[in-house]
Amino acid sequence: MLIEFTKMHGLGNDFMVIDLVTQRLDLTKDLVQLLGDRHLGIGFDQLLVVEPPMRPDVDFSYRIFNTDGTEVEQCGNGARCFARFVQARKLSFKQRLRVETASGIISLTTDHYGWVEVDMGKPKFEPSEIPFTPRATTKIQNAYHLDVNGTPVQLYVANMGNPHAVIKVDDVLDADVESLGRAIESHPAFPERVNVGFMQVMNQRHIRLRVYERGVGETQACGTGACAAVAIGIREGWLDEGEDVRAQLYGGSMVIKWQPGYSVMMTGPTAFVYEGVFSPDGLMAQAGIKPNPEI
C-alpha cells in the first residue's frame, strides 16, 4: 500500500501533509518517528493530517504530530499550509474554512496570492491555562523569574492553543536558544512541556524571534510562537495593539495583529515543495519495527 503525501513549508517551518479524507492509514508513534527522520524517512518539523470532521459545524479535523511522535494541540504555520493543501487537493473550494484542532476551532482564510490569514483565538495568560505551575518562582507584574539550573531567568507565559514561554532579549543572534530552550522546555514548572521563544523588540511594530519548539528543537519559524510573543509584547506595552506587527524569523516574516479582548490574527505565506508516496509497511520493515497500536 502506498500513501500519497505533500511536502510544504511556511517560512521554512517544514511539514509533511497527509490526506486521510480519501486515504486510510493507521498512524503509530513509531511510524511518525520514522517519517520524521530526515535520513530514514521524509523529514519534517511537524506532520499535518487532514481528517473528516467529527462535528457538523466544521469542514475538517486538523491533527499535528512532532518528530518525536507526540500529538500537539496547535501549529500556526501548519494551519496556513493546511488551508492551501485542502484547496490544492480539491477537498474543499471554500476560501474560508473552519477546522477543529485538539485545542479548539480555528478559521482559515486564503487570498488570491497564496497567503493565509488564521484566526488563532484569544491568548490565555493565566498559569493554569498554560499549564504552568510557578510554585518556586518569583512574579513581578506579569513576568516570572524561573530557576533554570541555578540561574534565574525572566520569562512571560501565554497559551495560543499550545503553551509558550517568551524571553525578551537584547539580540536574538546572541540568545542561547539551544541549551536554554531545551532546559526550559522540559522544566518541571511546565507539566506538558513548553515552546520557548526569544524575542527582540525592534520597534513597536517589528520584532525578531527565535523559537525552540517542544519536541522538535529550534525551527525556522513558529506561527503560534510569533502570536504568543506579539500578544505578550502588546500586553506589556512594547508593541502597538490593533496594528500589524511584523514578526521576523529565520525563515521570513509574518504579520500578527491583536486587539486585547479579541482573537489574534496571523497572516503569512505558504509554499509547496514536492509530492510523493511512501510505503508504511516498507518503512516499518526496513527499521525492523513490528506494528504497534494506533496513537
Curated annotation (Swiss-Prot):
This is Diaminopimelate epimerase. It comes from Psychrobacter arcticus (strain DSM 17307 / VKM B-2377 / 273-4). Its main location: cytoplasm. The keyword Isomerase applies. Pfam families: DAP_epimerase. InterPro entries: DAP_epimerase_AS, DAP_epimerase_DapF. Transmembrane segments: none annotated. One of its GO terms (molecular function) is diaminopimelate epimerase activity.
